[in-house]
Amino acid sequence: QQGGELAVEKKLYVERTLTGGKKELQPITASTQLAVGDKVVSRLTIRLDRAMDFVQLKDQRGACFEPMNSLSGYRWNGGIGYYVEIEDASTNFFFDSLSKGVYVLEYSYRVARSGQYEAGLATIQCAYAPEYAAHSASVKVEVE
């Protein structure tokens, strides 16, 4: 994060099934053990202190993750429309316009390979005013 006008936070959650069949999202930390086949939810929180046009968000994926929805296209969620581009190592979001406020995006992927990985970071930037940019932290993940 540079000046605070624009911020992005990335949190990863693993979906666990509790007794009784209820599903719960548990935050992923460096000590969380994942298994091949686990469903992981990436939650991206965007904060803007002013309205911005042509905002780009790139969410990098760890090499052990495969997106559950592999089709790119225009989406509508939480009152905002955006284009999603699914790539090999990242998911890109393109917003024509964002008003001041907080926005939360979520999408899911599956764990495909075992090993130790860096989950990747999220980077957000205003396309025609690149001085407005920020990035999130990343977390290490271990897959059995």
Enumerate the language-model features and the residues they cover.
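C-terminal segments of large proteins
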Residues: 1-144
